[in-house]
């Protein structure tokens, strides 16, 4: 029996919850759907008796991506829908070639969260039929239809040992470069072909001054608990440890999703995180803290024209406001995140149904595309997954060959980070299913 939809994900935290919501809706409509990770071993069944009718990808930038993500997973297929997870870009990225797709990737269906992204893609040569606006599925969990999906403030505070009576302020950090050494920044710059030294300096200065603001404010306001939601790459930060030791109402917490902290928080501040869109979709406001300007080539374009708090006094004044105005113009944020009265997962499922039932809109694997099967990757993935199942790290197994050990260990790290256990999947399904079943009737 063939499979109707195969959904591929890359980053678990970013994508899996939304993919599962979409899968459950498709199953509710009577279709078959499965979710797999991009680095899962290739399986014969997806090329033969269980070949999917529609391939739903997480990214699809060029012909090599079509080959790697589609051809090497299921063979030939012209029904390719990209969930297009990277849409919050800087102005430099929006103008460049990579994020506007090349080759036959322009013939795939590149879904768009809002009209501004669709217009940009059309300005760069895509046809309107291939860049439909669906809204952002991950934002649906913040809609009124999903009320009760996240814990309330009291339950969340008790889970993390915070006083629910206190004012809960959430800071969403993006200081990923602040904890990197000069040598690490240099190495990253050489690898990417871009000099990140200036932006790393902006990270450090911004973090230092922001923490100074928090230190002063928390000393004056013991009734406020500030939860510092660190960036995933913010590690080994003595500044955070020192402030947490000095101020008992400063808490560095990474556990829990950023969405549930947004829903629970009494007030929110942010630097340059794209989570500002989630704040808006949750019906809340926030303060944009910018002690120093951010280089435009790194600043998400959604922040353009925003209202920044650049001094401690402006930050403190914002904290005193009961309902501060949202710092980004409505037309800008809704241009990137379509505010349809209908949830995005339903609109996305509608699109997938159309793609399934109608002839292919285009030919991504037609002229201009040359398929090739990557046998090295095929055997490497099976080998690494075997080591992962046996809990054997490649650097220990291949100690006799540094090059092989490093190569296999890198893939092993990706596999380990993306792994979702069957128990975790069941728990997420049980949590999401009631909202799908109670939603729009099929």
Predicted regions and their residues:
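Short amphipathic alpha-helix with an adjacent loop that forms part of the alpha/beta core around
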Residues: 44-50, 158-160, 318-322
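Donor nucleotide-activated moiety binding/catalytic core segment of transferases
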Residues: 227-277, 282
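Conserved catalytic-core segment of nucleotide-activated headgroup transferases in glycan assembly
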Residues: 147-242
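Short active-site oxyanion
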Residues: 53-55, 105-110, 225-226, 264-267, ...
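Active-site and donor-binding regions of nucleotide-sugar-utilizing enzymes
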Residues: 4-150, 174, 234, 276
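Short, conserved active-site loop motifs that form the nucleotide-linked donor/cofactor pocket
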Residues: 108, 131, 249-251, 306-307
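Catalytic binding pocket for nucleotide-activated donors in carbohydrate/polymer assembly enzymes
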Residues: 242-245, 267, 274-342
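C-terminal amphipathic helix plus adjacent low-complexity
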Residues: 317, 323-442
């Amino acid at each position: 029996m063939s499979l109707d939809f195969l959904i591929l994900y890359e980053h678990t935290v970013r994508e899996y919850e939304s993919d599962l919501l979409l899968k459950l809706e498709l199953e509710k409509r009577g279709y078959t759907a499965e979710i797999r990770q991009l680095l899962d071993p290739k399986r014969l069944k997806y090329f033969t008796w269980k070949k999917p009718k529609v391939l739903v990808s997480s990214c699809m930038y060029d012909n090599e991506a079509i080959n790697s993500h589609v051809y090497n997973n299921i063979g030939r297929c012209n029904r390719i829908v990209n969930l297009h997870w990277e849409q919050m870009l800087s102005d430099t990225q929006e103008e460049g070639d990579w994020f506007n797709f090349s080759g036959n990737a322009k013939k795939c269906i590149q879904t768009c969260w809002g009209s501004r992204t669709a217009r940009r893609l059309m300005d760069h040569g895509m046809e309107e039929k291939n860049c439909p606006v669906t809204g952002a599925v991950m934002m649906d969990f913040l809609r009124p239809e999903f009320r009760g999906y996240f814990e309330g403030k009291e339950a969340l505070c008790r889970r993390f040992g915070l006083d629910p009576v206190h004012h809960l302020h959430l800071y969403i950090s993006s200081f990923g470069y602040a904890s990197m050494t000069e040598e690490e920044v240099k190495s990253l710059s050489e690898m990417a072909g871009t000099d990140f030294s200036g932006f790393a300096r902006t990270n450090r200065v911004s973090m230092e001054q922001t923490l100074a603001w928090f230190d002063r404010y928390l000393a004056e306001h013991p009734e406020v608990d500030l939860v510092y939601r660190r960036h995933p790459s913010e590690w080994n930060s003595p500044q955070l440890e020192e402030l947490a030791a000095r101020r008992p109402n400063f808490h560095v917490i990474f556990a829990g999703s950023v969405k549930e902290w947004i829903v629970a928080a009494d007030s929110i501040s942010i630097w340059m995180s794209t989570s500002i869109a989630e704040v808006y979709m949750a019906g809340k406001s926030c303060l944009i803290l910018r002690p120093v300007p951010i280089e435009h080539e790194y600043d998400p374009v959604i922040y353009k024209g925003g209202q920044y708090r650049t001094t401690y006094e402006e930050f403190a004044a914002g904290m005193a406001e009961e309902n501060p105005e949202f710092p980004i113009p409505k037309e800008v944020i809704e241009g990137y995140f379509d505010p349809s009265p209908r949830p995005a997962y339903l609109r996305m499922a509608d699109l997938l149904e159309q793609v399934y039932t109608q002839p292919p809109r285009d030919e991504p694997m037609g002229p201009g595309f040359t398929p090739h099967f990557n046998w090295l990757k095929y055997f490497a993935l099976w080998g690494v997954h075997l080591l992962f199942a046996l809990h054997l790290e490649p650097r220990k197994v291949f100690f006799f060959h540094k090059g092989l050990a490093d190569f296999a260990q890198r893939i092993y790290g990706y596999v380990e980070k993306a792994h979702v256990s069957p128990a975790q999947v069941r728990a997420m399904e049980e949590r999401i299913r009631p909202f799908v079943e109670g939603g729009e009737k099929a």
